[in-house]
């Protein structure tokens, strides 16, 4: 007798699946293409949206610094004289303290007559994805008032444009021109729109462009001192004003606090060290001076 172990094992071979028809293959290709398009579309939207939303402009081809670029003396005896009228035009509420806090401290102590114009309310701030723009606008305006009071600004004007969308158009130029004509400054401090850092906020560049045009159009101020520039021809020694500048930065509590404040202080100090080296000082602030008349 044969046991069950001796019985042959029957292996069932499944019937081959029918080959897809040309119509089925075409439908499968269409579905795959649609899936890829969805994925590429999402990636493109995220990348393009991020590039569009971020506020910085980058000069992929570096701008050439003027050569020669000799030192310029913007009549410093008059700049630091008591009663000299100085107009400060910035893009955001914290720009003046961040970029030229040392010079402003010196001008305040010398008795200058200071007036400030802020083009946008900085309502997006540094945390624009997670901020309440309306609330931030109120907070940042108050911080700007507190800071301006600390460096003895006689007046402060908000133009009220939205953060990140400033343009050097006729309207902005006209408003800055009005401020120049009313205040009649001898000196105007503004961003350098012609020779900015390679990567810088677009509002900084546009406010600088608009201010330069307004200054040349009105032909009232004698000197235009442009900061945040890669082509400085005048360096202010701010070694003794560093503590003052740190105190000014700390006023903007909504933007600079905790470890972020320390990081911002280090960033500003590093920039001041670079400018100071150009002028032979421990710390400095660089300006590109243009004589208007």
Q: Predicted regions: what is each one?
A:
Residues 5, 9-25, 29, 40-57, ...:
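The feature marks non-catalytic terminal segments
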Residues 157-160, 188-193, 226-228:
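Short beta-strands and strand-loop turn motifs
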Residues 175-223:
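Active-site adenylate/phosphate-handling loop in enzymes that bind or generate adenylated species
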Residues 14-40, 47-183, 213, 217:
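Active-site rim/loop-helix segments in enzyme catalytic domains that contact anionic ligands
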Residues 123, 131-132, 162-166, 194-202, ...:
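Short histidine/acidic/glycine/proline-rich micro-motifs that form metal-
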Residues 140, 172, 176, 206-211, ...:
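Internal, well-ordered alpha-helical segments in soluble enzyme and binding-protein domains
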């Amino acid at each position: 007798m044969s046991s069950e172990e001796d019985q042959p094992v029957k292996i069932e071979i499944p019937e081959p699946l029918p080959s897809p028809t040309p119509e089925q293959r075409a439908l499968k290709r269409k579905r795959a293409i649609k899936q890829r398009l969805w994925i590429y579309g999402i990636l493109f939207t995220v990348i393009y949206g991020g590039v569009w939303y971020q506020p910085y402009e980058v000069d992929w081809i570096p701008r050439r610094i003027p050569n020669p670029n000799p030192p310029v003396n913007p009549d410093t005896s008059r700049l630091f004289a008591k009663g000299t009228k100085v107009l400060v035009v910035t893009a955001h509420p914290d720009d003046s303290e961040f970029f030229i806090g040392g010079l402003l401290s010196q001008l305040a102590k010398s008795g200058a007559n200071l007036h400030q114009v802020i083009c946008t309310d900085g309502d997006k701030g540094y945390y624009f994805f997670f901020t309440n723009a309306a609330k931030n606008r109120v907070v940042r305006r108050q911080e700007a008032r507190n800071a301006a009071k600390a460096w003895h600004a006689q007046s402060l004007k908000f133009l009220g444009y939205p953060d990140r969308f400033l343009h050097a158009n006729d309207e902005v130029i006209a408003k800055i021109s009005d401020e120049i004509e009313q205040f009649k400054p001898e000196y105007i401090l503004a961003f350098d729109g012609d020779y900015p850092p390679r990567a810088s906020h677009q509002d900084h560049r546009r406010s600088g462009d608009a201010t330069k045009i307004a200054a040349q159009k009105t032909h009232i101020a004698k000197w235009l001192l442009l900061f945040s520039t890669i082509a400085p021809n005048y360096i202010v020694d701010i070694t003794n004003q560093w503590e003052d500048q740190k105190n000014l930065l700390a006023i903007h509590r909504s933007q600079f606090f905790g470890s972020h404040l320390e990081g911002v202080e280090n960033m500003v100090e590093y920039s001041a060290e670079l400018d100071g080296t150009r002028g032979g000082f421990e710390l400095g602030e660089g300006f590109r001076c243009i004589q208007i008349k």
